Amino acid sequence: MNMDWALFLTFLAACGAPATTGALLKPDEWYDNLNKPWWNPPRWVFPLAWTSLYFLMSLAAMRVAQLEGSGQALAFYAAQLAFNTLWTPVFFGMKRMATALAVVMVMWLFVAATMWAFFQLDTWAGVLFVPYLIWATAATGLNFEAMRLNWNRPEARA
């Protein structure tokens, strides 16, 4: 399969939506004061992980977009990207942990559906999506644990 740079860069640009919300709504004093699980990664891990994931996601989507019958897979891709974009404003902006948990759980379902659909069309595209599903699983767990460990705070139940 050929590397279609225009297509790759288009998908990478689409990752700019969640990247922008992440850059604009960074963890703040509120987040610093939350009780978090012992396995919560240090802050510097997040931009490195997301940069790597956006690259892999874009490469996978580029491969799939070149194939016949990729419409459903790309619809799943767009949906997971939309929920990815939504999570940061809900969690960090609105400080609504329970609502953010619902958002990240739906995102996880679309990430899993995207990975499955990609595997059906192109094995390498599916493989490229595996790290994202692992990261989304960890993110869901972190959101749940932040909510659970801070249940006495009103924003945990919102």
UniProtKB/Swiss-Prot annotation:
One Pfam short name: TspO_MBR
Cell location: Membrane; Cell inner membrane
Mutation effect (W39F): Increased levels of carotenoids and bacteriochlorophylls
Recorded topology in the membrane: Multi-pass membrane protein
Result of changing C15S: Leads to decreased levels of the protein and increased levels of carotenoids and bacteriochlorophylls
Coiled coil: none
CDD domains linked: TSPO_MBR
Documented effect of changing W30F: Slightly increased levels of carotenoids and bacteriochlorophylls
GO molecular function: identical protein binding; lipid binding; tetrapyrrole binding
Source organism, top-level taxon: Bacteria
Consequences of knocking out this gene: No effect on chemoheterotrophic growth, and no defects in the production of photosynthetic pigments. When oxygen levels are reduced during chemoheterotrophic growth, mutant cells respond more rapidly than wild-type and display faster accumulation of carotenoids and bacteriochlorophylls.
Subunit structure: Homodimer.
Name recorded for this polypeptide: Tryptophan-rich sensory protein
Organism: Cereibacter sphaeroides (Rhodobacter sphaeroides)
Gene behind the chain: tspO
